[in-house]
């Protein structure tokens, strides 16, 4: 291979390794068999959630994973691989890809990484069942509001009972 090609591939490895280091979550899938229309819809959904989705050669992915400290992730880079990176929402790529795979059986989740730790296919699927960030925040808010609401209702009940007694 010419030195220019080797340099270009080394640069690509560096770019992918940086994306892997910066990502909150990484999901690796086998998208072989998706139609162009399905792939376009999937990419649009992922882009809407600020998830970057790329088809990258396995040799480059293996080298980038090594460089990013995710050596154990190399075992999923077998066969055609596409990678979804999310820097913000840990759940988004897993949720979108899992939901999409229910309608498009050709899409298969292979594994990934969560917050810099390698995750198996089962762990990625478990992550996909969690509510998204907004859902988790609303659950937290309702848990925090419950005691205040209970105190307010108790005070209101006491006030009403005193009014009835008077």
From Swiss-Prot:
Domain of life according to the entry: Bacteria
Keywords: Ribonucleoprotein, Ribosomal protein, RNA-binding, rRNA-binding
Species for this entry: Streptococcus pneumoniae serotype 4 (strain ATCC BAA-334 / TIGR4)
NCBIfam families named among the record's database cross-references: PRK00099.1-1
Family in the record: Belongs to the universal ribosomal protein uL10 family.
InterPro entries the UniProt entry points to: Ribosomal_uL10, Ribosomal_uL10-like_sf, Ribosomal_uL10_bac, Ribosomal_uL10_bac_type, Ribosomal_uL10_CS_bac
GO annotation terms (biological process): translation
Its biological purpose: Forms part of the ribosomal stalk, playing a central role in the interaction of the ribosome with GTP-bound translation factors.
Subunit structure: Part of the ribosomal stalk of the 50S ribosomal subunit. The N-terminus interacts with L11 and the large rRNA to form the base of the stalk. The C-terminus forms an elongated spine to which L12 dimers bind in a sequential fashion forming a multimeric L10(L12)X complex.
UniProt keyword Nucleotide-binding present: no
Keyword hit for Transmembrane helix: no
Organism classification: Bacteria, Bacillati, Bacillota, Bacilli, Lactobacillales
Protein name: Large ribosomal subunit protein uL10
PROSITE patterns: RIBOSOMAL_L10
SUPFAM superfamilies: Ribosomal protein L10-like (SSF160369)
Positions in coiled-coil regions: none
A Pfam cross-reference name: Ribosomal_L10
Single Gene Ontology MF annotation: structural constituent of ribosome
GO cellular component, one term: large ribosomal subunit
């Amino acid at each position: 291979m010419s030195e220019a090609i080797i340099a270009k591939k080394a640069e690509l490895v560096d770019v992918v390794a940086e994306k892997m280091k910066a990502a909150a979550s990484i999901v690796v899938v086998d998208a072989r068999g998706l139609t162009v229309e399905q792939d376009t819809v999937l990419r649009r959904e992922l882009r809407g959630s600020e998830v970057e989705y790329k088809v990258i050669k396995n040799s480059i992915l293996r080298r980038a994973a090594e460089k990013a400290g995710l050596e154990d992730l190399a075992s999923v880079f077998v066969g055609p691989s596409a990678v979804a990176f999310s820097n913000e929402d840990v759940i988004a790529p897993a949720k979108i890809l899992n939901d999409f795979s229910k309608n498009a059986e050709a899409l298969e989740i292979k594994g990934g990484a969560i917050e810099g730790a390698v995750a198996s296919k089962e762990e990625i699927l478990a992550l996909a069942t969690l509510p998204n960030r907004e859902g988790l925040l609303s659950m937290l808010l309702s848990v925090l509001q419950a005691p205040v609401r209970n105190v307010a209702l108790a005070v209101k009940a006491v006030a009403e009972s005193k009014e009835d007694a008077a």
